[in-house]
Amino acid sequence: MAADVPPKATLTQKAGAIAYRIFCAILRILDIKVVAIFGRVIGYLVWAFMPGRRKIVARNMRIVVDPTLRGRKLSALVRRNMVRTTMNMACTFKTGIMTEKELQKSVTLIGSESFEEMAANGQTVIGCIPHAGNWEILARIRPLFPKVKRYGSMYRRLDNPVLEDIVYKSRTKFGCEMFSSKKGLKEVFRLAKEGGMLGVLSDQFTQQGVFIPYFGKVTGTTPLPALIYKRCRGNGHLIAANTRNTGLGKWDAVLSNQIKISDSSADSLAAITMEVNNALEAAQRESIIDGFWMHHRWKATREFATNIDDEQKEQIRKYCKLPYRIIICVPEEFEEAILTIPFMRELRACRPDIQLNIVCPEEQQAFWKTQDYVGHAVTTNKPLQQLESDELYKDGPYDMLFMISENGKVFRELQALLPLYITGFDDSPLRKGIRAKCVRPIGDTPEHKINDYLALASEHITLTKQPYVDSSKGNQSATNRYIAPFSSLGTADCWQTEKWKELVSRLEGGVQLLALEADKEKATSLAAELGIPCVLTKPETAAEVLGPQCTLYAVDGLLPQLAALVGCRCHVIMSSRLAAVYAPPGDGHKVVYRHSPCHPCYRNSCDQASPCNADISVDDLL
């Protein structure tokens, strides 16, 4: 506490402390109403000249009031809140130096009698305080409760040691003990044991807290009130203590909102903290404009799913109303984009409130809409307009953007959505706009492309080994054998027609030709030449014809990747892409890989006299 030897102050810090003393001297001679008017004027200036803060408040208003707010109605709420908040903040400085007479004129206590009874006779009251109104009042009203043995509050020490000493003395002058979180919790727990009142600002974001809903959206919440309550061993009471503005220079200090903890919740930190959040939310809803919404209460941090245990997940499932919204802008090549599936499944599994919003080329959209881990899928054609449509807007603000695509135009549109955290690869041409840059894994031998995306996920969450293959999604009764002679990668990956004829003859009947509808004309012609049925499918319907009991003989491309997705066994010829990097994921596949010195070439058409796979025989494939 202040009794400790403070670090030596710098010249700048000393100057700041002198300026603060002068400021307080001026405040002493001003009436609280004058300070409030001055605060409102400053509030209008803050609103007018700080667009960044306006955006933060607008985001928070959509969370605490209505996620569908937009336009003039949202702007009006933002203005009112910024003006009110600045007024309240200005008045907190005056509150610390007000006389008892001035305080009595400005503050009305609600529930003070029951509050004092609870805090007397060895009982402990933990006052859970939101950042709302003029919360400095709660430190000043200590003399009004003579029966309370000890009266204290948690606070964050200032970096300026001179200013810290001044503020500390002003806060303790009237008998309120101040406990710094930097000094540990020993004195706090001693107060809890001896009895009294302890105030804790309970609505601050903390990465080390429990991740549970507040106003229906998950955020890191301090479990300190719950910890202190449990330490009281039955002699503790939790209340939501808040202040709200009722007029120019006037506030109510509400001390009557007791938080009842059920027997089923008493042993769970997450459950007790959830009850605290619910009570604070109810208290703040009585005057939502008084809330301090000019900071990011619902932050998106690099690690957004750390140590979320089953108790927290239970509270999330029970109380979450607004999801944690992740935008994933996938690669434009379908064959590459589909390899992000394990990455997506990892993200979706890390927290119950995760919502994945996929931004993709139009030809991919229908496929992503069929995936149960995907919330919404929009196209790269005006994605901002789609993501802000009424259907998607109602789920609240976006939190995080994984920019995997290298489409700069799309990236600029997505930045306009103001995601709080943007992440991607360090070798992306868009890396200047990416906050968290992941280095692709580099080993002694080439690694599968899936591992790149899992490495990106591991930068933010703990991986749980989510698979690429989900055989339950395929056609369980299908036992067909298919050939897939057309590659979505281009003619460089095609195999000679004579060899397909030989393969069909050696498979001895029951073989069908499988192709994407984009290759309909070529597929029907070749199927007629081979004398076998032709089955056409789309990426989004491939699971209807393929299943874990099917076998596919194919050239590299999208179809073998779709087949592997549902557990179909694949025999694949690869030439323009490295097999170690792009082979169909899963077990039981056979890959035959050939390349000449000029390859892998990644060309749509081969410019060589003889393609790489020309020497692959039917025996090799079988």
Residue ranges and their predicted role:
Residues 105-109, 160, 178-182, 218-219, ...:
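A conditional alpha-helix N-cap/helix-loop micro-motif detector
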Residues 53, 70-72, 82, 120-121, ...:
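Catalytic machinery of carbohydrate-active enzymes
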Residues 107-112, 252-260, 440-441:
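Short amphipathic
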Residues 121-182, 207-210:
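Catalytic core of membrane glycerolipid acyltransferases/transacylases, capturing the structured
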Residues 2-3, 11, 49, 79, ...:
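Non-catalytic C-terminal accessory region of glycerolipid acyltransferases
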Residues 2-129, 169, 306-318:
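Membrane-anchoring hydrophobic helices of lipid-metabolizing enzymes
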Residues 61, 229, 288, 347, ...:
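Residue-level signal for inorganic ion chemistry
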